[in-house]
């Protein structure tokens, strides 16, 4: 899963990568950290992204550098990605914005840099297989603006696309907020445009500079591509909210016209800024508590109380869970309201009017199978008017949660939360109303914020996490001989 990375332009020497194991603790305290292996590189600064492939290799994208390591963080290969020259010959550092894999042809995809373009790279030697001498603008070229991208199917076209969400930018003509990019063929990284429509969603020209959208995370689920976003509550508002937006992977015409949005709420309205997200199928106990459908997954999101203009997170955080079946119903309601609404005032509420070409026809019969994915001419860009409230299970009064990853251990659902002070919180998600934070792990050699990318190894016995200049692999064993420590199973929500 991809996410928002607000990177710094400050250059600091050396990236340190460390393999660590961490002993089980019985309470929230400093961890006993055992260093197993280290990797250092003096040619780089400021890490941006990490991803693991199906074979266990780990890829790390830093400023002007890209690495491939094995599962033990042993160095395998690296390549230089920057700096890049502008038209005047001035050099600009290359900050990576997107790092993802197209498994159909075993290619690593990287995006970023001064031109905001993408490269298709060999998974093994990291060399660019396909690039362009005339860059295709895909993502923002500003280090402080967000971009999220991931590879997911497009069933009508018959091959995957690179789904991208990026903050409004000035580098290049008309970069769409949300787009589906070709990753095969002659028009690589171009938007799909043909007689049926296009795979792009643009903000209305009137709001290009006044309606910024921050992209936090993205994922694929049940033939839709989703993005977690932060945006203004209304076009003329100074208040910000978090929204989930999606496009359909099945549309056979008018491709992305079925783009729609739903507002996310957690705890109360003050927790308005989504910081990180993770989608997974929880373990048995939590699945039963949530009454999940077969194979249904849950979206975990970390929120922060924010201050506005610009939207800035504070150290008050909350974790909310969303059943994907409820999310899907909320999007269905948005489309249905857009199609069958009665009267101009209702029609206006269901229209995502900040998007170029948005319209709700109204007064038409709604058929989910026909309209939810294929907009045809009945609507373009629906806005849900009913907020989607999550299960509020944990909160922190003095901790900014910056990243989240969730896994299952036996019948338990366990989360790992990165913080703004460089620690990791271990959380037991017990049921639909509560969770227990039962351990705090100190991130060795750094108090810098944990960045969003947290991934598990192939066996899910370790997880990888990093700050902007330290990369580590943790063992997350919290039990002894298959049994949880007493504090883990005895603590109860009160």
What is each residue range found by the language model?
Residues 217-219, 318, 405-407:
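Residues within well-ordered beta-strands of beta-sheet-rich folds
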Residues 47-52, 59, 98-101, 217-218, ...:
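Short, exposed beta-strand/loop patches in secreted or surface proteins that constitute
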Residues 75-107, 112-210, 230-398, 410-494:
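Beta-propeller fold recognition
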Residues 2-5, 13-40:
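N-terminal signal peptide
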Residues 28-37, 42-75:
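N-terminal-proximal low-complexity accessory segments that begin disordered
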Residues 45-49, 401-404, 448-455:
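Canonical WD40 repeat/beta-propeller blade segments in eukaryotic WD-repeat proteins
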Residues 209-214, 218-220, 226-227:
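Surface-exposed extracellular loop regions of Gram-negative outer-membrane beta-barrel proteins
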């Amino acid at each position: 899963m991809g996410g928002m990375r607000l990177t710094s332009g400050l250059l600091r020497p050396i990236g340190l990568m460390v393999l660590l194991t961490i002993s089980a603790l019985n309470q929230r305290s400093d961890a006993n950290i055992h260093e197993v292996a280290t990797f250092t590189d003096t040619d780089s600064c400021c890490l941006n992204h990490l991803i693991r492939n199906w074979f266990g290799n780990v890829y790390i994208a830093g400023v002007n550098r890209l690495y491939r390591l094995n599962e033990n963080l042993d160095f395998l290969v690296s390549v230089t990605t920057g700096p890049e020259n502008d038209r005047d010959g001035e050099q600009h550092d290359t900050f990576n914005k997107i790092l993802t894999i197209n498994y159909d042809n075993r290619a690593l995809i990287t995006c970023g840099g001064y031109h905001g373009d993408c490269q298709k790279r060999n998974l093994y030697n990291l060399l660019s297989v396909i690039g362009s001498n005339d860059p295709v603008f895909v993502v923002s070229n500003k280090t402080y603006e967000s971009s999220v991208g991931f590879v997911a199917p497009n069933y009508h076209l018959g091959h995957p696309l690179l789904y991208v969400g990026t903050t409004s930018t000035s580098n290049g003509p008309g970069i769409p907020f949300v787009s589906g990019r070709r990753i095969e063929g002659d028009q690589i990284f171009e938007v799909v445009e043909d007689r049926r429509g296009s795979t792009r969603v643009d903000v209305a020209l009137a709001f290009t500079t006044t309606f910024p959208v921050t992209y936090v995370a993205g994922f694929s689920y049940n033939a839709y591509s989703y993005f977690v976003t932060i945006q203004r509550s209304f076009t003329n508002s100074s208040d910000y909210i978090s929204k989930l937006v999606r496009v359909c992977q099945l549309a056979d015409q008018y491709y992305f016209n079925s783009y729609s949005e739903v507002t996310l709420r957690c705890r109360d309205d003050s927790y308005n800024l989504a910081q990180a997200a993770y989608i997974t199928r929880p373990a048995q106990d939590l699945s039963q508590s949530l009454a999940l459908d077969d194979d249904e997954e849950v979206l975990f999101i970390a929120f922060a109380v924010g201050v506005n203009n610009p939207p800035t997170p504070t150290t008050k955080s909350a974790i909310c869970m969303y059943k994907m079946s409820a999310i899907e119903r909320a999007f269905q309601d948005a489309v249905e309201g857009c199609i069958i609404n009665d009267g101009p005032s209702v029609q206006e509420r269901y229209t995502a009017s900040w998007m170029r070409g948005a319209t709700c026809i109204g007064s038409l019969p709604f058929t989910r199978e026909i309209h939810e994915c294929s907009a045809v001419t009945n609507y373009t860009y629906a806005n849900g008017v009913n907020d989607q409230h999550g299960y509020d299970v944990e909160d922190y009064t003095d901790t900014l949660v910056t990243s989240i990853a969730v896994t299952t251990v036996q019948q338990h659902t366990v989360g790992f939360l990165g913080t703004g002070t460089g620690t990791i919180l271990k959380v037991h998600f017990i049921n639909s109303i509560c969770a227990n934070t039962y351990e705090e792990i100190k991130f060795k050699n750094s108090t810098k914020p944990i960045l969003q990318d947290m991934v598990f190894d192939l066996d899910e016995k370790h997880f990888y996490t990093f700050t902007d200049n330290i990369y580590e692999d943790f063992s997350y064993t919290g039990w002894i001989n298959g049994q949880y420590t007493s504090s883990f199973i005895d603590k109860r929500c009160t």
